[in-house]
Amino acid sequence: MFLNSPDPVCRSTSADHLYRRSAVQAGNGTALRRRRLFAALVSVTLLGGCAEDALTSRFQLKPDDIIIERRPDTAYEKLFPYYVELCAASRFRSKLTGEGGGPAGHAILYIKGACKDDEAQFPQLRRCRGVATSLEDPEHGTGVSVNQLFKNVNWVATPGYELVFPGNLAPGERLTLARFQAVEQQAIAKGIYRGVTFHRFAGATSDTELRDFLERAGIGTDLALQFARSVFCARLPVAEAMLEPIIAFLNDKNREYAEGEADYNWSAWADNCSHTMRNALAAANIWSPLSVRTTKIRQIFNLAVPANEFVNLAELMTGGDIEDYRDILRNGPRRDAFHEFDWLPTRQGALLKTLPVHDPNDLYDTTFWLFTLQSPFLMGKTQRAIELLSDERFVDLDTNLHYFERRYAAILAQHDERRDSMASVRGTRFRRVEGLYYDYIHIQRAEVQSMLNRIVAMPTTSEE
């Protein structure tokens, strides 16, 4: 169902409850609104097709400023049974045709624990059978991708990490036309686009012509992303129960188009890939949703840009306030996630991943280009992305676990000191919530310590 209510309240039948933007999120003040509006107006100029000049280059994430390739090691899959990865992919350009994507790039959501439903007549998800401990497991997970050429669905599901990201191409192996055609055939055989019709595009012979679509806009966008793009992912472990509302939201989204009368019409402003990915995560209370297809003025405040959403999630899962339970109560999505799933988004295992475009590459330009939406004077999003991708706490699993172990220990130590000094006080109006919160912190600390012990006991292996 669309999250398209013009009110601060958006209903999703898939999540089966109302999402309310908190007062802080809904009204951050006139100054913030003006800054966001200014940034939006700047984006109009850039997205409108201007050349890659000095101004435009200021909005790019540059490979010289960041770690080119970082990925969680093999231990990660054994420690975390379920996670979501929100990925921003850079702009692509074909060497053969000269065609390329828009400056904002692309967004994709990878879900460990959700698998493609091969029995469905159009793209749908189901729970994976069992818990995967290896990326090679066929029941590991699925990549969900929105494409502007889709007509009767909003997204498709590509099964398996290897097909979603490297396209089954080994590091250092040359991407040739033959390897491209092999992946094309694999996509057809796996039924990734079963039941999907497309908006007509130049050169297409029909609205179901799959090979034309794959060659023009499928491979490098919906699957085999590294054939054509560099990819940045924010990986966030989730509770098992959180998979259900995410899957339900996405299935409902496709069902509305596949079984309803309306066609899906992609919009950079009002209904793009990032809107779907963000709102799928909002269905599980990871953060607040964004409205789609509201009035034009309202939509300015609901823009979604792949790189921005990557940074937003990265900031939430690495730097959110978990020290004060009262702050958690003031934030609607965090409060709901805590009470419903016994889960907070700032947590151990929250890591950033960077994957470069394949090189050597006969088919696509390997020049890096990824746009962020921001003020040209402050450049906050670009700088924040560079900082996070350069911080060992958020790219290295062992460092990450030790960081959160210290953080949890400090919270508990401070609580012990406060409890001793307030021993004569019988409690506060938040007494029950406080108890739940500190029980949660104890459990998280014990989980981190268990993970560190398990890593020590694991045989040494190379990175995946």
Regions inferred by a protein language model and the residue ranges of each:
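Activation targets extended, charge/polar-rich intrinsically disordered C-terminal tails
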Residues: A51-R71, G195-E464
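Intrinsic-disorder-associated, low-complexity terminal segments enriched in Asp/Asn/His/Tyr and depleted
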Residues: N4-D7, D16-Y19
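N-terminal secretory signal peptides and thylakoid transit peptides that target proteins
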Residues: T30-L41
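Secretory targeting signals
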Residues: F2, V24, T30-A31
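Intrinsically disordered, low-complexity N-terminal segments that are enriched in acidic
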Residues: L55-F180
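Low-complexity, serine/threonine/proline-enriched polar segments
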Residues: T142-L225
